[in-house]
Swiss-Prot record:
Protein name: Protein AaeX
GO CC, any one term: plasma membrane
Domain of life assignment: Bacteria
Entries under NCBIfam families matching the protein: PRK11594.1 (NF008615)
Subcellular location: Cell membrane
Keyword Electron transport: no
UniProt record similarity statement: Belongs to the AaeX family.
TM helices/strands, residue ranges: 8-28, 47-67
Record-linked InterPro entries: DUF1656
HAMAP family xrefs: AaeX
Length: 67
C-alpha cells in the first residue's frame, strides 16, 4: 500500500486504503443481497459477525488486487 500517494480532496487527505474500502462496499452489498435469499443466513450463528468478516475478506481481496 505504500506505493500509492495520499489523495487530497477539498483539503482532506485520504490514504489509498480508503478507496479500497469504498470499492469493497458495493461488492459487499451485492454479495449480501445474493446470499440472503439463498438461506445461508439461516445456518449462520451470528449474521452481523459474518457480515463483518465478509466485508473484511472483500476489503483484503480488493486491496490485494488493486493496491
Amino acid at each position: 500500500m505504500g506505493t500509492l500517494p495520499v489523495m487530497v480532496l477539498f483539503g482532506l487527505s485520504f490514504p489509498p486504503a480508503f478507496f479500497a474500502l469504498l470499492a469493497a462496499l458495493p461488492l459487499f452489498w451485492l454479495l449480501r443481497r445474493l446470499l440472503q435469499p439463498s438461506g445461508l443466513y439461516d445456518m449462520i450463528w451470528h449474521p452481523a459477525l459474518f457480515n463483518c468478516a465478509l466485508y473484511g475478506c472483500l476489503f483484503y481481496l480488493v486491496s490485494w488486487l488493486f493496491i
